[in-house]
């Protein structure tokens, strides 16, 4: 198994555990998708993917419909996606994806978390290169052979395909998302969920006390309403 498999195994059950937080993130994704490509999922592949993800976290259908309707209102502010980079204690690189309607607020908040937890907020590009930006798709196993599927999808950008208890996961570079999404839909394969992740190229092992220092910063960052995802180079 490759790095995507190990990364997924390490993060399982750790992030997106709070349902309310998941709903908030999906809501923001819906707004950004509708503002970008319109409210019709059939004509908006990004919105189609978000709706699939809403089902994966059991978000009520009426919540999704309400969010789409709200997003079509020209008075509804769009969210800007901003990437923050820095270091936690003990040399652990931190990469933070945010979606904010107030850039100044978000910058000030993220900086304060680093300062309070003995971290250092970095400049653009300071740690992003340490992570591979990937896309992923979860589909039902339905008796499919992951190895055969991987061979079939290599030409569309797939790099790693493996099975777990929840189905089959497909990993590919960030830029292959649209190509693989289209191919799966063309084949009539149900997409249970999809998304993007940043996988650290190298991880660092820490002591329990050092892990606690890093987790303190990560938890503080994750509590912020503007934060969508936090990635790091700490071994899990």
Swiss-Prot record:
A GO CC term assigned to this protein in UniProt: cytosol
Keywords: Cytoplasm, DNA-binding, Transcription, Transcription regulation
One annotated GO biological process: regulation of DNA-templated transcription
InterPro entries (UniProt xref): Integrase-like_N, TACO1_YebC-like_2nd/3rd_dom, TACO1_YebC_N, Transcrip_reg_TACO1-like, Transcrip_reg_TACO1-like_dom3, YebC-like
One GO MF term: DNA binding
Major localization class: cytoplasm
Protein's cellular compartments: Cytoplasm
Protein family according to the UniProt entry: Belongs to the TACO1 family.
HAMAP family attached to this UniProt entry: Transcrip_reg_TACO1
NCBIfam families: PRK12378.1, YebC/PmpR family DNA-binding transcriptional regulator
Protein name: Probable transcriptional regulatory protein FP0835
Organism field: Flavobacterium psychrophilum (strain ATCC 49511 / DSM 21280 / CIP 103535 / JIP02/86)
Lineage: Bacteria, Pseudomonadati, Bacteroidota, Flavobacteriia, Flavobacteriales
């Amino acid at each position: 198994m490759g790095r995507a498999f190990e990364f997924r195994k390490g993060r399982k059950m750790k992030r997106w555990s709070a349902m309310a937080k998941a709903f908030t993130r999906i809501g923001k994704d819906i707004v950004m998708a509708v503002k970008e490509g319109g409210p019709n999922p059939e004509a908006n592949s990004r919105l189609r993917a978000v709706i699939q993800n809403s089902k994966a976290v059991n978000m009520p259908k009426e919540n999704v419909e309400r969010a789409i309707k709200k997003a079509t209102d020209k008075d509804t502010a769009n969210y800007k996606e901003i990437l923050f980079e820095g270091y936690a204690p003990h040399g652990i690189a931190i990469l933070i994806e945010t979606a904010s309607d107030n850039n100044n607020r978000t910058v000030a908040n993220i900086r304060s978390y680093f300062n309070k937890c003995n971290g250092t907020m970095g400049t653009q590009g300071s740690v992003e290169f340490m992570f591979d930006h990937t896309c992923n798709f979860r589909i039902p196993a339905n008796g499919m052979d992951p190895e055969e599927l991987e061979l079939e999808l290599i030409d569309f950008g797939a790099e790693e395909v493996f099975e777990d208890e929840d189905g089959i996961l497909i990993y590919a570079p960030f830029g292959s998302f649209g190509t693989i999404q289209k191919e799966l839909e063309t084949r009539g394969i149900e997409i249970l969920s999809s998304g993007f992740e940043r996988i650290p190229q190298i991880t660092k092992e820490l002591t329990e006390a050092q892990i606690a220092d890093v987790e303190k910063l990560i938890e503080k960052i994750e509590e912020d309403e503007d934060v969508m995802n936090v990635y790091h180079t700490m071994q899990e």
